[in-house]
């Protein structure tokens, strides 16, 4: 026999509160607890460089999933600013892309513009300041060439007298003689190269056979300078 005092206790087991609370507790106990994923080694995320601030940091499980599966990360809309993108780990790739595009699309800095302007001004100034060539007359050129053939270097007194006879300044005569000596040197070097080339060709032909003596060929070649 069950005493009257024990009936309320038994009836309490089947009350509405006990029936509602028991499934909740069982469901909570049966649910598997998620194990925290903490990679021991730094995880490489596609699109991120190892030297970025996010490398080696605590990563979100969703980020690890996309990194392991090779799927592309969701990209945030381009309307978002870099401050809002940086707050979410999933938008790191978009942030880097946004920064790189901003860096590429950014106009030339003021310093670079100033340097370009200065270089252009210097080139333009140098070009405008170049003195025009002295328009020598035909008679003056003939006299200068004759004087150069007789003497390539003039003394100060000779240059003063010669420039006065041609109605030219001493500087003009001096510069003309300098340029003429440089031209004569170039012509001599070109003639030497021609002689070397002819000699090499003659020896090559003699080595093949059937060609005359190279010395007989070079005897007809008279360098002119």
UniProtKB/Swiss-Prot annotation:
Chief localisation class: nucleus
Region Disordered, annotated ranges: 1-44
Bias kind Basic and acidic residues: ranges: 23-32
Assigned GO CC terms: nucleus
Keywords: Developmental protein, DNA-binding, Homeobox, Nucleus, Transcription, Transcription regulation
CDD domains: homeodomain
Effects seen without this gene: Worms exhibit the absence of AVM, PVM, and PLM touch cells, defective egg laying, embryonic or larval lethality, cell degeneration, malformation of the posterior body, and uncoordinated movement.
Tissue: Expressed in the ectodermal cells of embryos and seam cells and ventral cord motor neurons of young larvae.
GO biological process: embryonic morphogenesis; locomotory behavior; parturition; regulation of transcription by RNA polymerase II
Name of one Pfam family that matches: Homeodomain
GO molecular-function term, one example from the UniProt record: DNA-binding transcription factor activity
Subcellular localization: Nucleus
Residue ranges flagged as DNA-binding region: 129-188
Function: Probable transcription factor needed for the proper production of touch cell precursors. Involved in specification of lateral neuroblasts. Essential for embryonic morphogenesis.
Family statement: Belongs to the Msh homeobox family.
Protein name: Homeobox protein vab-15
Gene: vab-15
């Amino acid at each position: 026999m069950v005493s009257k005092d024990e009936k309320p206790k038994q009836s309490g087991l089947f009350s509405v509160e006990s029936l509602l609370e028991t499934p909740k507790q069982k469901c909570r106990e049966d649910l598997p607890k998620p194990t925290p994923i903490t990679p021991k080694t730094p995880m490489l995320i596609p699109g991120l460089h190892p030297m970025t601030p996010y490398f080696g940091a605590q990563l979100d499980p969703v980020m690890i999933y996309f990194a392991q599966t090779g799927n592309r990360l969701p990209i945030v809309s381009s309307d978002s600013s870099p401050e809002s993108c940086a707050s979410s780990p999933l938008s790191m790739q978009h942030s880097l892309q946004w920064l790189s595009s901003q860096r590429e699309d950014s106009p030339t800095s003021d310093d670079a513009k100033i340097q370009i302007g200065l270089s252009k001004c210097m080139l333009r100034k140098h070009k405008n300041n170049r003195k025009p060539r002295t328009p020598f007359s035909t008679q003056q050129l003939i006299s200068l060439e004759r004087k150069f053939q007789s003497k390539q270097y003039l003394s100060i007194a000779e240059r003063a007298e010669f420039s006065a006879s041609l109605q030219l300044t001493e500087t003009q005569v001096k510069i003309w003689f300098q340029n003429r000596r440089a031209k004569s040197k170039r012509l001599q070097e070109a003639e030497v190269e021609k002689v070397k080339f002819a000699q090499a060709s003659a020896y090559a032909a003699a080595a093949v056979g059937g060609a005359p003596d190279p010395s007989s060929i070079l005897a007809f070649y008279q360098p002119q300078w």
